[in-house]
Amino acid sequence: PDKNTQRVVGSVDVYKRQLYNYMTVNPLNLHWEIKGNFLLNCNCDVFCNCPMSLGRAVPNSPNGKCFSWWGINIEEGYAEEKWSGFNPIKRESKGIMDLSGLNVAILLEVPGPLGSGGWTAGLYIDEKASDDAADALAVIFSGQAGGQTGWFRHMIANFLGVKRCSISYKETDDGWSFTIPEILDGRIEHEPGKERGEVVKVSNLKYWVAPEIIVCKGSKRSRIRDHGRNWDFTGGSAEYCAVDWAGP
């Protein structure tokens, strides 16, 4: 297979065994922390109503459904296995895994309000990650390790699997980009504010991602193509947040 889209054969098998056979929350017993940058581009009109409604409102998209890609650039991060008592995997802890400098992307399809569940999700993990770090990221971003992403485990109804890919993140003059060759060409640009050179922000939010969001839109031909989907989010709602997450 193309190395840019190859499946994480060993890691995904381990991840699925832990997640579906043991059916335990936080199967690796991870304690984790991630600081970095979060990008999202969806098919809603600018501005998506999820941040203000906390995911309760019907998407303000042409079809009432939410299609999106998410990108997480981890500037600093770690995951650590900590066993106390019951250990379903019957092995020693792998200790601290460095997640700094890695990228993660998500393809997400939601049939209605974000908080109503029924998600179809595909996960993409940086090929630079070690197998242990990839396992940890799969557990974190499937919601099994608690923290800010913990609610994902209640929302995901159809998991499309994990792919390890070359993933790049860049900050541009007018926005940000997230790229996976042959899959994601994600580009967003911030909306200009009243004051020249200033961006539009929404602050003091209870939103799960972060309390402050920079309002953005999809740049020309911002799109994702995978798992039978071909979505173009040019002009669609987008957001950028600086994130500081931890779990459980």
What are these regions (language model features)?
Residues 1, 16-31, 246-248:
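Basic/polar N-terminal segments that are highly enriched at the extreme N-terminus
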Residues 58-85, 94-97, 105, 205, ...:
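Short, positively charged
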Residues 18, 75-77, 180-185:
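Short, flexible beta-strand-to-coil junctions
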Residues 12, 42, 121:
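Residue-level detector of short, conserved catalytic/binding motifs and their immediate flanks
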Residues 98-248:
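Internal, well-folded beta-alpha domain core
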Residues 26-79:
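N-terminal ordered "arm"
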Residues 2-15:
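Short, small-residue-biased leader/transition segments that mark boundaries at the very start
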